[in-house]
UniProtKB/Swiss-Prot annotation:
Subunit and partners: The PsaA/B heterodimer binds the P700 chlorophyll special pair and subsequent electron acceptors. PSI consists of a core antenna complex that captures photons, and an electron transfer chain that converts photonic excitation into a charge separation. The eukaryotic PSI reaction center is composed of at least 11 subunits.
Reactions catalysed, as given in the entry: reduced [plastocyanin] + hnu + oxidized [2Fe-2S]-[ferredoxin] = oxidized [plastocyanin] + reduced [2Fe-2S]-[ferredoxin]
Keyword Iron among UniProt keywords: yes
Binding site for chlorophyll a': 675
Function (record text): PsaA and PsaB bind P700, the primary electron donor of photosystem I (PSI), as well as the electron acceptors A0, A1 and FX. PSI is a plastocyanin-ferredoxin oxidoreductase, converting photonic excitation into a charge separation, which transfers an electron from the donor P700 chlorophyll pair to the spectroscopically characterized acceptors A0, A1, FX, FA and FB in turn. Oxidized P700 is reduced on the lumenal side of the thylakoid membrane by plastocyanin.
Name of the protein this chain belongs to: Photosystem I P700 chlorophyll a apoprotein A1
NCBIfam families, A to Z: psaA (TIGR01335)
Source organism of this protein record: Lepidium virginicum (Virginia pepperweed)
Positions contributing to chlorophyll a binding: 683, 691
Length: 750
């Protein structure tokens, strides 16, 4: 007789038809809440409807039902993303000059929007070169499409239709996995299987398929494009895939097929999987062969990572075991209990993911210019500036979101009874030490960083340049940063065989890459001016962290309000008779953190914009002389507050202020309008609820007098609502103002 080990039983992890599909609930606003479903008595109703519609915690306390709603909403989100992508590709196919740009990317600007001639708006269609008139776009899609090997507008059409199909599919999936086959809670909590699928599937096979596409489609097509072949003459993608001889003409080792792979003679593939470093002098982008190699390597790493965790076959790591074994000499119970937190609190999970994704997004911002991944991206200054600014803002918002959801976790999901002496408990017990030290650091950084500028302004005003902190007087060189730059500049040849240049030209080493007479990238010098502004960065980041961390650590209780957890995530004050307890909720800390995040990111993007125009971007003559856009004025001008105001904000705002009557005039209007939106926010931030309630009551009196009073009673915004509206307009106004200022400037001079 044969003895078999018992087969692991496959558990059924979905419920069939849990919730019937009905459109009737759509007709009942607020169907998720008993109070809101009754309909409006006062105008507060519409605000509560918006505040709670997506707050699934407030609809039910059943974790399984909440999980299903979140899961289903994710498919809705993906559907919108595919729809948006489809729109981008459709614009490229239908309204753009992509094919013209492809034939001459150095002299023709990218445009994918042509304004219709209504009331004279066609003035916005500027001349982007090659006889095409339209709005210059700065999203980087053209460069991305070229890198992917897209050579015609027909291919863009096909991709747009494909994305539309996927959008519909995602919409269907969201409905199906909520109404027809909804996963059970156990499925959402099976972290090892999730890691298996996300690491090996999404990241591993995703990177592998992209690497395959790059090798078989992107590389040969870009090889032809770089050689100046007409895009219409280049074979179509499927021809490269089906006909190996075509590829073998470009990369002879293709003729040998997979033999070198299985005989471990991998160096045969070094024609198209390279490790060169630096930039391709033809396109000013990273070597596409380096990028293909990178994605292949990433794929291998993640395919291995995806097979490290214990699923149906009892081998591999268990996340719970790893976390509980993670103890240090000073950390008590260590991560014991963290597994339970992360599998039962989606806020805790989301908080970690937002913190990491936000940091990663900021890392992306810094790599997009220092290692420009796509052909002709580095010389498209408007796109470079836009991509940096965009990723910085997004990263800032995600990090504030991380603090918001950490605080919601503390208020709603944290259970102090079964948390004793683990790391989180230990952090909470010495939160006073953490916050007071952080506060001291903020005071130190604020006074010293700002003090250096004030010193320089004073000396400059008194006509004593020799007593200023500058590269030509009292030097404060960023020696550590310069040391890191130098180390990287010396690295090629020592770190990897065959590497000819360092990871980024910005490190140093003297070489410069220019494309079509424009600088793509060159070594970026750091001096006293950078030292000063970097300490402003340190200051603003630390203050943001102070506010957000205080909100999280004191979300449940504080000396002022020991029972804060009972008041919830957002509340205006601790009730009547408790003066001085307003604006202390966890929500209020997020509110305040947003302003400091805005400060921090603004300084970063201003620094970047000016530094690049002053020391990197510009034109190069036949003799090799580089002329920068602002002629290297950053080092001497940005060392005083006055310099920032005069030589950056004011001097560079001339393009947006003088844009009326030109194709950039829309930016002038946005600049004006966004200032108004920003100023509008102050009305909400600087006045109290009672003021508005009094005003409303006299307006209601007038309506009653004329017998036109509505059935729904008007009410002033609550304190929290008013602050929410205020911060929203503050950020929207500020960001849109910056956007108009940056783009009008860089499109005009770049």
């Amino acid at each position: 007789m044969i003895i078999r080990s018992p087969e692991p039983e496959v558990k059924i992890l979905v419920d069939r038809d849990p919730i019937k599909t009905s459109f009737e609930e759509w007709a009942k606003p607020g169907h998720f809440s008993r109070t809101i479903a009754k309909g409006p008595d006062t105008t507060t109703w519409i605000w509560n409807l918006h505040a709670d519609a997506h707050d699934f915690d407030s609809h039910t306390s059943d974790l399984e039902e909440i999980s299903r709603k979140v899961f289903s909403a994710h498919f809705g989100q993906l559907s919108i993303i595919f729809l948006w992508l489809s729109g981008m590709y459709f614009h490229g196919a239908r309204f753009s000059n992509y094919e013209a740009w492809l034939s001459d990317p150095t002299h023709i600007g990218p445009s994918a929007q042509v304004v219709w001639p209504i009331v004279g708006q066609e003035i916005l269609n500027g001349d982007v070169g090659g006889g095409f008139r339209g709005i210059q776009i700065t999203s980087g899609f053209f460069q991305l499409w070229r890198a992917s090997g897209i050579t015609s507008e027909l291919q863009l059409y096909c991709t747009a239709i494909g994305a539309l199909v996927f959008s519909a599919l995602m919409l269907f999936a969201g409905w199906f996995h909520y109404h027809k086959a909804a996963p059970k809670l156990a499925w959402f909590q099976d972290v090892e299987s999730m890691l298996n699928h996300h690491l090996a599937g999404l990241l591993g096979l995703g990177s592998l398929s992209w690497a395959g596409h790059q090798v078989h489609v992107s590389l040969p097509i870009n090889q032809f494009l770089n050689a100046g072949v007409d895009p219409k003459e280049i074979p179509l993608p499927h021809e490269f895939i089906l006909n190996r001889d075509l590829l073998a003409q470009l990369y002879p080792s293709f003729a040998e097929g997979a033999t070198p792979f299985f005989t471990l003679n991998w160096s045969k593939y070094s024609e198209f999987l390279t490790f060169r470093g630096g930039l391709d002098p033809v396109t000013g982008g990273l070597w596409l062969t380096d990028i293909a190699h990178h994605h292949l390597a990433i794929a291998i790493l993640f395919l291995i990572a995806g097979h490290m965790y214990r699923t149906n076959w009892g081998i591999g790591h268990g996340i719970k075991d790893i976390l509980e074994a993670h103890k240090g000499p000073f950390t008590g119970q260590g991560h014991k209990g963290l597994y339970e937190i992360l599998t039962t609190s989606w806020h805790a999970q989301l908080s970690l993911n937002l913190a990491m994704l936000g940091s990663l997004t900021i890392v992306v911002a810094h790599h997009m210019y220092s290692m420009p991944p796509y052909p002709y991206l580095a010389t498209d200054y408007a796109t470079q500036l836009s991509l940096f600014t965009h990723h910085m803002w997004i990263g800032g918002f995600l990090i504030v979101g991380a603090a918001a959801h950490a605080a919601i976790f503390m208020v709603r999901d944290y259970d102090p009874t079964n948390r004793y002496n683990d790391l989180l408990d230990r952090v909470l017990r010495h939160r006073d030490a953490i916050i007071s030290h952080l506060n001291w650091v903020c005071i130190f950084l604020g006074f010293h960083s700002f003090g250096l500028y004030i010193h320089n302004d004073t000396m400059s005003a008194l006509g004593r340049p020799q007593d200023m902190f500058s590269d030509t007087a009292i030097q404060l060189q960023p020696v550590f940063a310069q040391w890191i730059q130098n180390t990287h500049a010396l690295a090629p040849g020592v770190t990897a065989p065959g590497e000819t240049a360092s990871t980024s030209l910005t490190w140093g080493g003297g070489e410069l890459v220019a494309v079509g007479g424009k600088v793509a990238l060159l070594p970026i010098p750091l001096g006293t001016a950078d030292f000063l502004v970097h300490h402003i960065h340190a200051f603003t980041i630390h203050v943001t962290v102070l506010i957000l961390l205080k909100g999280v650590l004191f979300a449940r209780s504080s000396r002022l309000i020991p029972d804060k957890a009972n008041l919830g995530f957002r509340f205006p004050c601790d009730g009547p008779g408790r003066g001085g307890t307003c604006q202390v909720s966890a929500w209020d800390h997020v509110f305040l953190g947003l302003f400091w995040m805005y400060n921090a990111i603004s300084v970063v993007i201003f620094h970047f914009s000016w530094k690049m125009q002053s020391d990197v971007w510009g034109s190069i003559s036949d003799q090799g002389v580089v002329t920068h856009i602002t002629g290297g004025n950053f080092a001497q001008s940005s060392i005083t507050i006055n310099g920032w105001l005069r030589d950056f904000l004011w001097a560079q705002a001339s393009q947006v202020i003088q844009s009326y009557g030109s194709s950039l005039s829309a930016y002038g209007l946005f600049f004006l309008g966004a200032h108004f939106v920003w100023a509008f926010s102050l009305m909400f931030l600087f006045s109290g609820r009672g003021y508005w309630q009094e005003l409303i009551e006299s307006i209601v009196w007038a309506h009653n007098k004329l017998k036109v009073a509505p059935a729904t009673q008007p009410r002033a915004l609550s304190i929290v609502q008013g602050r929410a509206v205020g911060v929203t307009h503050y950020l929207l106004g500020g960001i849109a103002t910056t956007w108009a200022f940056f783009l009008a400037r860089i499109i005009a001079v770049g």
